[in-house]
């Protein structure tokens, strides 16, 4: 089966070189969309994916993913074997503590309760409840249909969340980090809890007992991204500034906290 990795990235960076190296090393073919263009938001990225998928009629499976905070750890053959075992049209990465979007916290809490209820009803023992838009995998036609449904979402990640909440058969969550590992924890947390560990050049999740073939360090988790890099990629300088500009999805979730901190600092200066 033919597999193609698609990413949208508007500028060269060392992080992108890590992504490219990891894809090539593990046997994946890839295409970068949007290079040299101005970043215009998540809906724009969704449309980029739709346009490319409509052109790529000879590819069986697509991996749509970030490329500034993500890299491949397992081979294409391992990926294919795992994905086919799920017998699903679409799979999405999952994380434990991020419900994005500009909706009210009350509404988000309702969504969170629903996501946890879905997992419980499926007898899924996990803490990874929340879809992460940084890696979506699937077959061409179902992906196009999903992306078209999600095109109006200002935040594509929250859009995927609502689509899954309203129809649990539409997307298969990678609850156990089997294919897509999403690491958002701090280094201090990992040192204490050992949730994610590095064995040679693979990353292991001790909670799910899995070795993902794709690792995504979401939420500007640059320190762990660098910490878990493949030995060959450690030779490439790490440049976190790119993600803050282009992929600051989690940034708006922390704006309130940032404002409070600034107010406290201002008061301390005055007194």
Where do the PLM segments sit?
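Generic preference for well-ordered alpha-helical elements
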Residues: 16, 43-46, 69, 73-76, ...
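Catalytic core and acceptor-binding pocket of nucleotide-sugar-dependent glycosyltransferases
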Residues: 124-227
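N-terminal anchoring/stem segment of glycosyltransferases
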Residues: 1-61, 85, 251-268
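Short, aromatic/basic amphipathic alpha-helical patches
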Residues: 16-25, 104-113, 227-233
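Pan-eukaryotic secretory-pathway lumenal catalytic ectodomains of glycan-active enzymes
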Residues: 195-266
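Conserved donor-nucleotide/metal-binding helix-loop-beta segment in metal-dependent transferases, i.e.
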Residues: 70-121
